[in-house]
């Protein structure tokens, strides 16, 4: 975590004034069906999944308190791309996101979208499905192309019944990229998310920096374009924020597992608002 002390900065009072600048809605995707499917996996299978795809399964279990994200968003400082509170700034870092996602960058190439989406043949090979059959499932939603989450969940169920667990884990990771890491349209895995997943699967390109950039980009859109709905990377952002304002999480080997273990207090929306208003440098980890 990076904390910058900014005492007496113009435009930022040192009093604990409640801020409300942007009326945004934070929408977490429905992942209950995916959670039920994961319950069918053995411990060995879950361990194999984590070894290949990092902390996605633990992030799937995180119950995001969306009022926390709404309250945090009011302190986003677009020109500085950080969260400015009373007398300090919070800046999510690559190192923190590496830890949360359990995807170390060392020795890996960062994912960088090069302007071309994944060919259907490549995706079909990963999903072990005929390209023509898969192409028929590709649709357009919200002006973007991709695959419906409902279809992918159905396909996961078929793979589970046939005990094709290796393919099941690949398709599960694909869906989690679409609904949890790079969501754009509700209940839909678009080609941007598919391309990021395939780059990781086939080229070992690490998505951590892209996810952090997506967080910043989403907040920028909320402010500059008056975009009122926020879907992006909510479990990752929530874990980062709560681990900064909850005791005993900063030095955890994995803050996700720590949060699952300690079950953060369920707060009312106004409690999150006041928590952010009262934050100062002494109250953060």
Descriptions of predicted regions:
Residues 1-285:
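Structural stabilizers in ordered domains
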């Amino acid at each position: 975590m990076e904390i910058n002390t900014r005492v007496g900065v113009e435009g930022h009072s040192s009093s604990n004034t409640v801020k409300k600048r942007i009326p945004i809605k934070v929408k977490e995707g429905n992942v209950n069906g995916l959670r039920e499917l994961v319950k069918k996996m053995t411990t060995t299978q879950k361990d194999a999944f984590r070894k290949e795809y990092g902390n996605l399964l633990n992030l799937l279990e995180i119950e995001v308190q969306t009022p926390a994200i709404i309250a945090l968003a009011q302190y986003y400082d677009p020109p500085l791309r950080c969260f400015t509170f009373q007398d300090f700034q919070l800046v999510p870092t690559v190192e923190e996101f590496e830890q949360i996602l359990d995807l170390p960058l060392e020795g890996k190439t960062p994912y960088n979208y090069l302007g071309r989406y994944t060919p259907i043949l490549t995706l079909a090979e990963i999903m072990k499905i005929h390209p023509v059959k898969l192409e028929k499932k590709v649709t357009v939603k919200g002006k973007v192309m991709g695959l419906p989450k409902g279809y992918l969940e159905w396909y996961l169920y078929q793979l589970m019944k046939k005990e094709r667990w290796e393919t099941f884990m690949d398709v599960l990771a694909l869906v989690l990229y679409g609904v949890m890491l790079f969501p754009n349209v509700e209940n839909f895995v678009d080609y941007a998310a598919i391309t990021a997943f395939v780059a990781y699967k086939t080229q070992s390109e690490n998505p951590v920096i892209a996810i952090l950039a997506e967080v910043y980009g989403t907040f920028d859109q909320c402010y500059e374009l008056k975009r009122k709905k926020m879907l992006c990377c909510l479990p990752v952002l929530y874990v980062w924020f709560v681990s900064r304002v909850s005791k005993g999480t900063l030095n955890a080997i994995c803050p996700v597992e720590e949060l699952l273990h300690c079950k953060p207090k369920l707060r009312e929306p106004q409690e999150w608002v006041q928590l952010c208003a009262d934050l100062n440098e002494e109250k953060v980890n």
